[in-house]
Amino acid sequence: MTLLNNKKPLIAHVLFRLGTGGLENGVVNLINSMPDDKYRHAVICMTDYTDFRDRIKKDDVQVYCLNKKPGKDFAVYFRLWKLLREIKPDILHTRNLSALEAQLSGLLAGIKHRVHGEHGRDIDDVDGTNPRYVLLRRLFRPLVQRYIPMSKDLETWLIKQIKVPANKITQIYNGVDISRFKISGDKPVDLLPPDFRSPDLMLIGTVGRLDPVKDQITLVQAFIHLVKSCPDVRNKVRLVLVGAGILQPKMRELSLEAGIDDLIWFAGERNDVADIMRTLDLFVLPSINEGISNTILEAMATELPVIATDVGGNPELVINDQTGYLVPKQDPTAMAEAFKHYLDNQDLLVCHGKAGRARCESTFSLNRMTTDYMNVYDNLLNLSH
C-alpha cells in the first residue's frame, strides 16, 4: 500500500465522462478543496472528457480516458483493470450507475477500499425502480465497501430499494464555495443584453444543461403563462437561461410561437456563472429529478430565493416560504403562480435570499463537505492497519 511507503494515498475517481454537470462539478470541487498534503487524485473517464477538466486546479491530477464505445463495450473493463494495476490507487471511488460496474475491475485489480457515490437519477429511471437497474445495483452491492448518497432521499432509496445495509452508508451533502459567490457590490449588468439591464426588471434565471431531466421546457411554459395571464408584467420580467443542450430548439420554438422571444436570453454555456448569478433576482430549478443540486446551492450562496420542483433532494435544500418555494414537477401553472407571488411581494426576494445564504453558510459549505469526505477516506484506510 502507498501508505506503507510514506506516500500520500491515491484516490481514483471513476466517472462516465468529465464534462459540464453537477456531479462532475462536485468531483472537481472536492479535488480542488482537499489539502495538498492529504491525498493524491486521479480521474478516470469511462468515455472521454471536455475542457471542463481545466477546472481542476492541481497540477498533479492525472485524467485518463478509456474511450468506451457506445453500447456494450466489455473490453473497457479490461482496459480499466490494466490501468488500475498500473496506478495502484488506495481507494476506488465510482459515481452513479454508469460507473458502478468499474467496481468489479477494482476488485480484480486488488483495490481493497471501494466507494460508490449516488448523485441522482436519469430521465429513464427518475424514481429508481427500473427492474434492470435495481438488479444491477443489487448484484454489485457486495463489492462496495462504502456508499455515499448526496441526499437523505437517496439514502432512503438505497436502504429500501437496493437493500444496502444502513451501516454501509454515509450521507454527504454537496458543498458550495461560498466565497466564490459575492453578495456585495454592484451587479455586473454589462454581462446582460441591453434590454435586460433595467433595475426595474425582475430577472428570473436558471443554470444547467438543457436536458429532459432538467425540464427547462416547463420553465419556459411557466414564463409564457405568466406573461399571457398578466400582460402588464411584460415590462417587468425577463428570463435568463444559462446552459446548452438538446432542449434548446424546442424552447426557442415555444418562445417564438408565444411571441415572447424578446423577453428570453439564451445565454449558452458560460464560464462566468457566479457573475451571471449576481445579475438575477430569482433562481428556478424545474427538474423532474435531482440529487443535491449544485446550482441551487450556488443560487442560495448568491442570496437568491429559489423556486424548485418538489423532487429528490430539493426539499432538503429549499425551505418552503423561508428560502423560496417548492412546486410540483411539470406544473407550469404552479410555477407561474410562484413567479407572480414574488413579483407582487418583492420584499420577499431579499428576505428569502438572505435566509438561503445563511442556510448555505451553516449547512452546505464546501469546507464541511470536504471534511466529511476526508473522514470517509480516512476511516477506510485505517481499517487496513
Question: What does each of the following model-derived ranges do?
Answer:
Residues 45, 305-308, 318:
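Short hydrophobic beta-strand element within catalytic cores of glycosyltransferases
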Residues 269, 288:
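Aromatic "clamp/platform" in nucleotide-sugar-dependent glycosyltransferases that forms part
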